[in-house]
């Protein structure tokens, strides 16, 4: 398991077998359980290391947790509160980090914006699309542009 502080990305959490009893950073009681968690240079009961927002047990939701602004967070809540992926290449609006996106080369798009930029046809899974002059094109518009000489013959 890992803790990531997005500012430095340092892995900091491991599951360790119980040795000498340690005090829990969450409840301040001795840890008598067989296993304990170590995060942020402190020891925790498995039940005490929880997301500050949704209260989920961080040892159960994955192998990564995040810290920021003195909060310990699961991935979902960290991204909801602090994350962004950048701007959509089609509409230029901000894309929240937790939102599903489509990517074409270095461009990132909202799912609703991932469409042919000439005819606005949305793509389905498996549809062929072309990236030409940094524009997303359906096969029909791309081929028409090739026939009309709008594009050179090299597909990007």
Curated annotation (Swiss-Prot):
Tissue: Expressed in the brain and not in the thymus.
Gene Ontology BP annotations: positive regulation of transcription by RNA polymerase II
This protein's name: Rhombotin-1
Top-level taxon of origin: Eukaryota
Chief localisation class: nucleus
A GO MF label: DNA-binding transcription factor binding
UniProt GO cellular component terms: nucleus
Plastid among keywords: no
PANTHER family: LD11652P, RHOMBOTIN-1
Annotated keywords: LIM domain, Metal-binding, Nucleus, Repeat, Zinc
Annotated function: May be involved in gene regulation within neural lineage cells potentially by direct DNA binding or by binding to other transcription factors.
Positions of the LIM zinc-binding domain: 22-84, 86-148
InterPro entries associated with the record: LMO_RBTN_TF, Znf_LIM
Coiled coil (residue ranges): none
Subcellular localization: Nucleus
Pfam families for this protein: LIM
